[in-house]
From Swiss-Prot:
An example molecular function term from Gene Ontology annotations: orotidine-5'-phosphate decarboxylase activity
Function comment: Catalyzes the decarboxylation of orotidine 5'-monophosphate (OMP) to uridine 5'-monophosphate (UMP).
Assigned EC number: 4.1.1.23
Subunit details: Homodimer.
Positions bound to substrate: 9, 31, 58-67, 115, 176, 184, 204-205
UniProt cross-references to SMART domains, sorted A to Z: OMPdecase
Protein name per the record: Orotidine 5'-phosphate decarboxylase
Metabolic or biological pathway: Pyrimidine metabolism; UMP biosynthesis via de novo pathway; UMP from orotate: step 2/2
């Protein structure tokens, strides 16, 4: 299994298609986010899917249960591999979303605490727990409800693995290669993430903005062995 999920963070459909074609044999999955979906909608997802690479649609859904269920109903026809939603939406929202995809190949993955957030950010929201404790709480709820796994940072992955077991998938974002700075606060290298128990690592710009995306993906994969 190739654990690399390449984030195609672009509004440019042609660029997304070109990257998907270039990387389809180099990564395990490609990720399309809210930026792409807002620009191109379901038709854009279908176009990228024609490149024959598994697709992860990262919409981080969070609304009342009925609205999320209807949204998942509309999305499930896209035949994607993974769809994300916020665990903080609560048990009923998660259960209703799961009921929609039960006969499809789409796996629902829960978002715990965004990797752009710190303990101080949680405190500002009135959440007394530290990030790691909040992630573990969300992970246990996600497993109890029946989600296929979660998204967290590598800093929490080992404890999630210990609490939830090997069949509960862990996708780590906030992965950094070399020296780069952005709005991520809880970061790790690809090797650190895999060693901590992650099943998949999400990597964007270190691959997509390199001179050779295919070569960069190959080098990252080799670094994991």
């Amino acid at each position: 299994m190739n654990p690399i999920i390449c984030a195609l963070d672009t509004q440019d459909l042609n660029e997304a298609i070109s990257l998907a074609n270039t990387l389809r044999d180099k990564v395990g999955m490609i990720k399309l986010g809210l930026e792409f979906f807002a620009a191109h909608g379901p038709s854009g997802v279908r176009e990228v899917a024609k490149c024959n690479v598994p697709t992860f649609l990262d919409l981080k859904l969070h609304d009342i249960p009925n609205t999320v269920a209807k949204t998942v109903e509309a999305i499930k026809v896209l035949n994607i591999e993974i769809l994300t939603l916020h665990i903080s939406g609560g048990t009923k929202m998660l259960e209703e979303a799961l009921s929609i995809v039960k006969d499809t190949k789409t796996k629902l993955i829960g978002v715990t605490v965004l990797t752009s957030m710190s303990n101080e950010d949680l405190s500002e929201l009135g959440i007394a727990r530290e990030v790691k404790s909040q992630v573990i709480l969300f992970a246990k709820l996600a497993k109890k409800v029946g989600l296929h796994g979660i998204v967290c940072s590598a800093l929490e992955a080992q404890e999630v693995y210990q609490e939830c077991g090997k069949d509960f998938k862990i996708i780590t974002s906030g992965i950094r290669v070399g020296f780069g700075h952005d709005d991520q606060k809880r970061t790790a290298t690809p090797k650190e993430a895999i060693n901590s128990g992650a099943d998949y690592i999400v990597i964007g710009r270190p691959i997509t903005k390199s001179n050779s995306p295919a070569n960069s993906a190959e080098l990252i994969l080799k670094s994991l062995s």
